[in-house]
């Protein structure tokens, strides 16, 4: 059940289970519902509760923590990860055969290689080239080790600038607070900014329009390692992100709702 109302989704799943549905999944965006219902959701007849914003926040946080990763997906209760990497000139993976890859990183599986417009299902005879996008799968622990070995020249993200203080920002801050980064959020609505400031005392909250280039310059956008645009308007997110790239911010993440 994925209606805009959490209560309707939960009730629909309860009813569906009583009518014989074997599996029921409810989209629940309110974190309070997720916390209170999790302990007894199965007895109510809800097999799984999903929170799109929370999952997005976790993905964004992982991308920030591991700058070389272009995308990351988790499976098996977050114990298995599929990551996408672009092979750079100075990467130890450049010009490596998959036979050599298997010898060196035996616990990691190369699932796919994307080379320009071509998608390659790899065999041992394939060679990884500069510019390839490779998709590798492994346990969470082995992926972390693999990342450290292959991204040793990558500078860790120490500071993050976020524009927009919506629900996704709250979830993202919940995750990032454990990463020991300097975080600044620019939010144009006073009430939301004050609530963020009260909820996250270690995060610097600025009242202003984060899509205004003058404000971004004033807040020192060029000094940040990562920039995340989470306003409610796709066009504003894209324009702000392009400006961040012009300012040589290392990692830029943009929220786009429209496909």
What are these regions (language model features)?
Residues 1-259:
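Cytosolic regulatory regions of ion transport systems
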């Amino acid at each position: 059940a994925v209606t805009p109302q959490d209560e309707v989704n939960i009730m629909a799943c309860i009813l569906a289970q009583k009518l014989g549905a074997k599996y029921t999944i409810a989209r629940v965006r309110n974190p309070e519902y997720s916390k209170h219902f999790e302990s007894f959701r199965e007895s109510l007849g809800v097999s799984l509760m999903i929170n799109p914003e929370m999952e997005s926040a976790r993905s964004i946080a992982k991308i920030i923590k591991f700058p070389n990763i272009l995308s990351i997906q988790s499976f098996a209760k977050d114990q298995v990860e599929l990551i996408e990497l672009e092979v750079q000139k100075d990467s130890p993976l450049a010009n490596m055969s998959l036979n050599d890859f298997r010898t060196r990183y035996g616990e990691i599986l190369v699932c796919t290689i994307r080379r320009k417009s071509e998608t390659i299902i790899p065999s041992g005879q394939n060679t990884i080239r500069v510019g390839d996008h490779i998709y590798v799968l492994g346990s969470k622990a082995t992926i972390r080790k693999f990342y450290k070995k292959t991204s040793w020249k990558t500078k860790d993200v120490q500071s993050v600038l976020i524009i927009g203080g919506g629900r996704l920002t709250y979830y993202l801050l919940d995750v990032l607070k454990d990463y020991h980064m300097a975080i600044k959020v620019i939010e144009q609505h006073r009430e939301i900014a004050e609530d963020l400031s009260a909820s996250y005392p270690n995060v610097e909250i600025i009242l202003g329009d984060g899509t205004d280039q003058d404000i971004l310059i004033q807040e020192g956008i060029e000094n940040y390692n990562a920039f995340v645009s989470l306003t409610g308007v796709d066009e504003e997110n894209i324009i702000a992100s392009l400006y961040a790239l012009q300012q040589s911010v290392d990692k830029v993440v943009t929220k786009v709702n429209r496909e």
